[in-house]
A protein has these predicted regions:
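C-terminal accessory module of base-excision DNA glycosylases/AP lyases that mediates lesion recognition
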Residues: 2-20, 25, 118-126, 133-188
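Structural motif
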Residues: 18-29, 39-41, 83-88
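Short, aromatic/basic-rich helix-turn unit that serves as a nucleic-acid recognition element
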Residues: 31-35
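Alpha-helical ds-nucleic-acid-binding substructure associated with the helix-hairpin-helix region
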Residues: 52, 56-127
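Short alpha-helix boundary/capping elements
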Residues: 39-44, 57, 101, 147-148
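Short Gly/aromatic-enriched secondary-structure transition segments
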Residues: 46-52
Length: 188
């Protein structure tokens, strides 16, 4: 797996040092955090990949894709669960791992580094299991705002989530204060 390109800062999404270090250093962990970010508190969703790594011993997409589905589901559902719907999300994690393994040679960063077209990046993210248009745009905004993945026209291709200074999504979370501002925005 590749490393994140143009790393700008250490991410502070999970509000947990170990989980945030993993999100900052492992792009597949970051993608899985985004996958888990639904019907579950944002910081707990982004702490999920650290739980998977601790319990499974690896975040290698090929190993996760090849894991026994029942055992992997048990690992994700064991309290404290990786997600509120741990067993269901285990299947999605494995499905995303399979796509990364098969379509991107196991290197998740190829989703965004093998093209300069921001619309193509969004399209590739949207095609991942468990990702719709909104989730794809939020993750692309996160890549752009916090990790420096900013091909020409990226803000226009992504839309409102890419707006400078916005507090709409996880793409805007850099500390506890911004996390609360995003929460307040979502409640409004």
């Amino acid at each position: 797996r590749g490393t994140l390109v143009h790393m700008v800062t250490t991410l502070r999404i999970a509000q947990d040092e170990t989980a945030d270090e993993l999100l900052s250093s492992d792009p597949f962990a970051l993608l899985l955090g985004m996958l888990l970010d639904q019907q579950f508190p944002m910081e707990r969703a982004f702490a999920g990949p650290a739980k998977v790594k601790e319990r499974f011993g690896s975040l290698d997409p090929a190993k996760i894709a090849a894991a026994d589905p029942e055992k992997f589901a048990d690992l994700c559902a064991t309290p404290p669960a990786v997600h509120r719907y741990g067993r269901s999300m285990a299947g999605r994690i494995q499905a995303v791992a399979e796509v990364v393994r098969d379509d991107y040679d196991g290197d998740v960063t190829r989703i965004w580094t093998s093209t300069d077209d921001p619309a193509e990046i969004v399209k590739r993210l949207k095609a991942l299991p468990g990702f719709g248009d909104q989730k794809a745009r939020i993750f692309a905004a996160l890549l752009g705002k916090q990790l420096g993945v900013q091909p020409a026209g990226w803000r226009e291709a992504i839309g409102p989530y890419a707006e400078e200074g916005s507090r709409r999504s996880v793409a805007d979370v850099t500390d506890e204060t911004s996390l609360q501002e995003v929460r307040d925005y979502k409640k409004a």
